[in-house]
Amino acid sequence: MSLEAVTEPGKCSIDPNTKDLLASQHAGNNTPLQENSSAPRSECKAQDAMSKRQMKKFLKQKQWEDQRELRKQKRKEKRQKRKLERQAQAEHNIDANSRKRFRHEVQPSALRLIIDCSFDDLMALRDVKKLNKQIRRCYAENRRAVHPVQLYLTSHGGQLKSNMDEYDKGWINWKDIHIKPEHYKDLIKKEDLVYLTSDSPEVLSELDETKAYIIGGLVDHNHHKGITYKKALELGISHAQLPLGNFVKMNTRKVLAVNHVFEIILAFLEKKEWKEAFFSVLPQRKGAIPLTETGEQPECRASEQEDGEDSDSDSSIDESATIQPSVRCEEQNS
């Protein structure tokens, strides 16, 4: 017998939400459930009390049903999360294996590369901070290199050391680097030293891995032009410049930052070719363009190019890279 809501006075009414539940609970019972029976009020109260318990159970069941889609969505999100975690773990394992393989392919070079930090008193603090960043870049590049060099920091102290301590004391845990307070002449034989300076008349053609090449750790914006060359002469050590002018035409005469010189040497050790090494490192803002095999600049037309920053170091760029306007080369029809 179907149940219908009754609102007549003196008769018990059952909440519509409870109908189905009450009906199902009385299924199979020989005594039919009648909502609109004329029961006394005391009997109605007892039935109302029963209804509350049943209502609580019903609401709980209803809440469960209402949240079915939410639970389904949560299970889906959980599965997706586990899937992403498995993918991330797999990628991590691949990267780890790749790094292991890469480290197995690394062949350290015997070449020693020294950053001379003895110019501390010639730099303002802002330039010392720049040098600190360049040194950190050198260290990071050397750690990733196929042929890492034997990296030295010499005459380490003063403002530079204080700034490195302030910036991040983690440098004391750096690996595969020799950080020394001593001058390089007290650490390495004089005949093995070669100062890389843009003012040297000597031009490197190859790198001798039995030598120790020195990069001047100086950020001076050309305020102390030629100081590294003079220092090499005073100490009576060999000097040379990178063969940049044989392969590259620059839009201005600018010396390279410490990290650029360092990266060019790392690139040459890997590629064994100066031109490729230069163009894999030189920033575009320096307006570098290749020379032809005859050593002449191809026919080009002037174009606008954003001016770069001042040079950061007095190290090793070939001075024959003379001032030229920024250019864009056109392909010539034969």
Curated annotation (Swiss-Prot):
Residues 85-98 have a biased composition (Basic and acidic residues). It catalyses: guanosine(9) in tRNA + S-adenosyl-L-methionine = N(1)-methylguanosine(9) in tRNA + S-adenosyl-L-homocysteine + H(+). One of its GO terms (biological process) is methylation. Residues 71-84 have a biased composition (Basic residues). InterPro entries: MT_TRM10-typ, MT_TRM10-typ_sf, TRM10/TRM10A, tRNA_m1G_MeTrfase_euk, tRNA_MeTrfase_TRMD/TRM10. Residues 62-94 form a coiled coil. It comes from the Eukaryota. Its EC number is 2.1.1.221. Signal peptide: none annotated. The keyword Methyltransferase applies. Residues 305-317 have a biased composition (Acidic residues). One of its GO terms (molecular function) is tRNA (guanosine(9)-N1)-methyltransferase activity. Belongs to the class IV-like SAM-binding methyltransferase superfamily. TRM10 family. S-adenosyl-L-methionine-dependent guanine N(1)-methyltransferase that catalyzes the formation of N(1)-methylguanine at position 9 (m1G9) in tRNAs. Probably not able to catalyze formation of N(1)-methyladenine at position 9 (m1A9) in tRNAs. This is tRNA methyltransferase 10 homolog A. It comes from Xenopus tropicalis. The lineage of its organism: Eukaryota, Metazoa, Chordata, Craniata, Vertebrata.
